[in-house]
Amino acid sequence: MDKGIIFLAAGGTGGHLFPAEALAHELKASGYAVHLVTDSRAERYAGKFPAEEVHVVPSATIGSKNPIKLAQSVWKLWTGLRAARRLIARYKPRAVVGFGGYPTVPPLLAATGMGVPSLIHEQNAVMGRANKMLASRVQAIAGGFLPEGTGAFAAKTVTTGNPVRPAVSEAARVPYAAPHGGPFHLVVFGGSQGAQFFSKAVPQAICRLDDAQRQRLKVTQQARPEDREGVTAAYDKLGIPAEVSPFFTDMAARIASAHLVICRSGASTVSEVSVIGRPAILVPYPYALDHDQAANAAALAAKGGARVIAQAELNAERLAGILSDAMNTPDALAQMAANARETGKPDAARLLASLVEAIASGSTVAKFKEARS
């Protein structure tokens, strides 16, 4: 059954594309054709994204105070807006859904200007800059961590949770096995683009563990390309079996195999760790403009599903102590895993797809909320 085309617009990083991918699978299963509107960075993820077509639209970040760079950004956004208008005129999508990042601005501005039903999904507990620009123009705002009852846009906000990909749903079927004295699998990653801080801190911390604990360890670590060789050499020197790579296509399965996860706290990361149900040490990215990662981490920690430590407070000695305690208290890890799973929203993609269908058919958020209650 062909219900028409839905445009999904997302910035080209995993944090934006992963929830868009999850929604795409749900919409396709419901009979919609999905087109992805994004930037050139999305190429590494395109293989698993179930889009009929992928459209790369020019866009730019507006943040520079340099007048020349500012003019270049404005021109690029204007070029992207014209391109997005042509796409909408050609394909006539039933709705346009934005997932954040500046590449969503041209297609969402085009949609709202041309009368196409539109909504945005905000993954974080704090709304990002691109979504803030669009919030007043769209018909609905779906939130991963945004509360429904507060803020200027409360009337059109629906807390759906963050959609997780089918691979995450599959990984969530694997029960957590508390490591009672046996091998201990540590999984370390920093979001889709890696984290340089972990490349130094984690090997240095493991170096400080006693021999018996190091002999139990197996490490899977995401590292940036420029750090990969150094991280691999550090683990080789310690005799730690380690798999180090800039990108893992099967990250969900690797999280499921972990006894403990150390990671950043982007919205998709927190949502996936929660749905899979694994204990985590969350280290929020300290340079985020809106401190959104700290807010995301706090939401999971409040339920006992993670421990949050600021990067400025985490040195090798402290991390070694945390790892040692974790390896010696498997029952506490199991409880943390159970708490994380309880906070997860495995049906977020289905709920978001229902909201998209409602908006595409001309309904309102008020009617959607009434039907849910």
From Swiss-Prot:
Topological relation to the membrane, as annotated: Peripheral membrane protein
A Pfam family of this chain: Glyco_tran_28_C
A GO term for molecular function: UDP-N-acetyl-D-glucosamine:N-acetylmuramoyl-L-alanyl-D-glutamyl-meso-2,6-diaminopimelyl-D-alanyl-D-alanine-diphosphoundecaprenol 4-beta-N-acetylglucosaminlytransferase activity
InterPro entries from the UniProt entry: GlcNAc_MurG, Glyco_trans_28_C, GlycoTrans_28_N
Catalytic activity: di-trans,octa-cis-undecaprenyl diphospho-N-acetyl-alpha-D-muramoyl-L-alanyl-D-glutamyl-meso-2,6-diaminopimeloyl-D-alanyl-D-alanine + UDP-N-acetyl-alpha-D-glucosamine = di-trans,octa-cis-undecaprenyl diphospho-[N-acetyl-alpha-D-glucosaminyl-(1->4)]-N-acetyl-alpha-D-muramoyl-L-alanyl-D-glutamyl-meso-2,6-diaminopimeloyl-D-alanyl-D-alanine + UDP + H(+)
Lineage top rank: taxon: Bacteria
Family the UniProt entry places it in: Belongs to the glycosyltransferase 28 family. MurG subfamily.
Purpose of the protein: Cell wall formation. Catalyzes the transfer of a GlcNAc subunit on undecaprenyl-pyrophosphoryl-MurNAc-pentapeptide (lipid intermediate I) to form undecaprenyl-pyrophosphoryl-MurNAc-(pentapeptide)GlcNAc (lipid intermediate II).
Stated name of the protein: UDP-N-acetylglucosamine--N-acetylmuramyl-(pentapeptide) pyrophosphoryl-undecaprenol N-acetylglucosamine transferase
Taxonomic path: Bacteria, Pseudomonadati, Pseudomonadota, Alphaproteobacteria, Hyphomicrobiales
Gene name as annotated: murG
